[in-house]
UniProtKB/Swiss-Prot annotation:
SUPFAM superfamilies: ClpS-like, Ribosomal protein L7/12, oligomerisation (N-terminal) domain
GO cellular component, one term: cytosolic large ribosomal subunit
Gene Ontology biological-process annotations: translation
Record-annotated disulphide pairs: none
Encoding gene, per UniProt annotation: rplL
Family: Belongs to the bacterial ribosomal protein bL12 family.
Protein name: Large ribosomal subunit protein bL12
Name of a matching Pfam family: Ribosomal_L12_N
Length: 120
């Protein structure tokens, strides 16, 4: 079979048949058909992708541990014992994979309560 014949056969296949062909090729050759992501450089510099999801990390409760526990309870919806456990285990993630706006609001609330917080 020539390359032209192979291409002609593929051209005449239905979408479901093409999907099965791709899956069979992936299994047979141990490869993935997902498209490679190519990132270009902008004006001689590397392109830096802006982070869209943030983790709010409680570094320590500071001197106002009770206020920080109350803030953690309010933010997470945890009970008193669970919130105290989170504060005692600092550094600990309070919220993960949230938007920048939400992360900054939570950080402000925890810092207002006396905690030391970082966003990652």
């Amino acid at each position: 079979m020539t390359i032209e014949q192979i291409l002609e056969t593929i051209e005449n296949m239905k979408v479901l048949e093409l999907n099965e062909l791709v899956k069979a090729a992936e299994e047979k050759f141990g490869v993935s058909a997902s498209a490679a992501v190519v990132v270009g450089a902008a004006a001689g510099g590397a392109v830096e992708e802006e982070q869209t999801e943030f983790d709010v990390i409680l570094d320590n409760a500071g001197s106002s541990k009770i206020n920080v526990i109350k803030a953690v309870r309010e933010i997470t919806g945890l009970g008193l014992k669970e919130a105290k456990g989170v504060v005692d285990e600092a550094p600990k993630a309070i919220k993960e994979a949230i938007s920048k706006e939400d992360a900054e609001a939570i950080k402000a609330k925890l810092e207002e309560a006396g905690a030391s917080v970082t966003l990652k």
